Amino acid sequence: MISESKKYFNENGYVVIQNFLKPEIYCLLYEYMKNKARRELIKQISPKSSHLYDKDLDGSFIDEQAPGAFSLYGDPLMDAVLQNSKDFISNIIEVDLIPTYSYWRLYITNNELKKHKDRPSCEYSTTLCIGYDTSNVEEEKYNWPIYIKSHNGEVKSVMLNPGDMVIYKGCDVEHWRNNFKGLNHAQVFLHYNNKNGK
């Protein structure tokens, strides 16, 4: 499996790993992310606590790539996921990795992720599906795809269920999401560089 994943990754610039997280882990992270976003929204709008708000420490609803989504850099819990996932990801892609940073977003209705490539600190990245609420959508089993333009220029629609992740070459492959129809969708991004790189 590892050699097949590595081959696919090298040929396409990405690879999907199903069931990376167990349900008890992704369910806990999903509740944490929803509660954190809710708490920070209250902190920002409440006259009693708005002076306590710090965008860099508490997160923000202002994200250039996904306007309106709540996002947070370097959450200590997600940094633990970043560190503890490194060896598994290194084994899959056969690259000695060094963690650079974690980032997470809680998307809401009509959010999109603009088409982009990642910055140099994201040579090897993952987007990890934590959970989503699409109970407002009539389409049965609605799943919000991430689009990835593979090395050969072909655009692939990648569906992730909670616990699944896609590992991709963040600086090399364009990726994006169209408008989200559901109520919320939680994703964690784990970013790494080649330990022996430039």
In which residue ranges do the predicted regions lie?
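Non-heme Fe(II)/2-oxoglutarate
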Residues: 1-92
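A short, polar/charged loop/turn motif at coil->beta-strand junctions and beta-hairpin connectors
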Residues: 8-11, 98, 140, 184
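A structural signal for short, well-ordered beta-strand segments and their strand-loop junctions
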Residues: 16-19, 98-100, 167-168, 189
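A short local loop/turn or secondary-structure capping micro-motif enriched for an aromatic residue
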Residues: 25-26, 123, 176
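Conserved double-stranded beta-helix
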Residues: 62-71, 80-142
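Catalytic core of non-heme Fe(II) oxygenases with the double-stranded beta-helix
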Residues: 109-172, 184-188, 194-198
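Short proline/glycine-enriched turn/loop segments at secondary-structure junctions
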Residues: 177-182
